[in-house]
Amino acid sequence: MNLRVALMLFLAVIMPIVRADEQSDKLKKAIAQELLKALLEDDDDEDKPKKPKAPAAPAPDAPVAAPAKKKGKEPTVAPKAPEPAPDAPFAFEAYQATPGAIYPSLVLATATIKDDGKEDDPRDATNYGDRMGILGVTLKNVRKDDKFVIEISADAVIRPSKLTFVAKASELLVTAAPKVKFDYEALGRITQTRPLNVTFKVTRNGQALDEVDEVLSLRQINDCPFALLTPTPKKNGKIVKEFHDIRFMFAAYVNENHPQIDQILKEAKATGVTKSFLGYQAGEKEVFEQVNAIWLALQRRGITYSSITNTTPVQGVNAQHVRFLDESISMTQANCVDGSVLMASVLKKIEIKACLVVVPGHCYLAFYSKEPEKGGKLYAVETTMLGSKAPLLDAINVATSQAPYSLQKNAAKFDQEDSGYMLVDLDAARDLGIMPIPYVKGLK
């Protein structure tokens, strides 16, 4: 089955070149303000962002590799699907969009995404029920007018869920997915991976068939899947593994509504770099001052770089452990993704447009100096430098123009398919329905 949310990719932007003066080792308030002013004055008109284009998809550093693209135009209409032989026995199997596992982060982040109504690939097996379903069944040798009842239940986090339908045609394979009734609050509290017993039951033409019981891996909420190799049933009776790039999932860990953001803003204001947080209501200089104040406040929190990213492997799924904002603050540790979602959460709270820049093996932050539609330029920030006490402008220079993975040095790659370079626009993610994973008080 296609994981339809994997098709909802975000805009990629050719990044502007940033030039800035060299910075002193110690950032003082007055010097910082002058340097920020100089940064704005040094920009050339030719550095305006180019027209957004479709983002690159699979990350080449991922163990799950995207299949090579075939040259030539793909057929838009599939040949007539073969029908099962008269004596072909009916059978069914359980399936999961993330094979062998359930990722609470994926369930919570995509819970409010609406079906876009677009036609499926005509070569895919007919789907009944939830086209974005996480769990379902594959039905083999279906006859026209067969009446089905599909039921899914589990020993935790899933309430009994049911789908009833009548087959529209005779087909070798079809998929069926009830709208699963997840216990979202319980999913948000899963802090350690555990086994989950899930029962799949099919009734055909009034006859209850043998149930299928599967033990799935219920992942911890910090596990963020970003690439999938999903078995997809086809009308010709074959099941083909298809690659899905879902790096938009990192946007689910950006939580602009987190209750601890107000305290961070209070501490940022106490730095004296800015008097208020007005987002784009003020000028570009004030925008940089707001970002700088937040940077200083987080540095004073003593956050250091931590490279812990691994999760227990699941076949066909690439995932990374991502800390929530409160975890990075309380543990004073953050890796590249953690630091980026932390700063992005605060910037989005004060309505400064932020993005996550995902490159092979790394992630960093980007923000616009003013609204993009008003000519705002995109600047990158290397958030792993928080722990080094580096000035904000050093972090901007590294991520925007100096590092091998920087925006300037890889501008063309953000327009190339399969390059592994993607800009995850947080506003676009929210518009799509990618929700922040809710904060759970007292979660350990």
What are these regions (language model features)?
Residues 16-20:
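Sec/Tat signal peptide C-region and signal peptidase I cleavage site
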Residues 6-14:
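Bacterial N-terminal signal peptides
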Residues 21-57:
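N-terminal propeptides/low-complexity segments immediately following signal peptides
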Residues 71-444:
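A structural boundary/capping signal
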Residues 8, 50-53, 67, 344, ...:
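A ubiquitous, low-specificity "background" feature that marks scattered single residues
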Residues 45-85:
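Acidic, proline-/serine-/threonine-rich low-complexity intrinsically disordered repeat tracts
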Residues 1-5:
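Positively charged n-region of N-terminal signal peptides that target proteins for export
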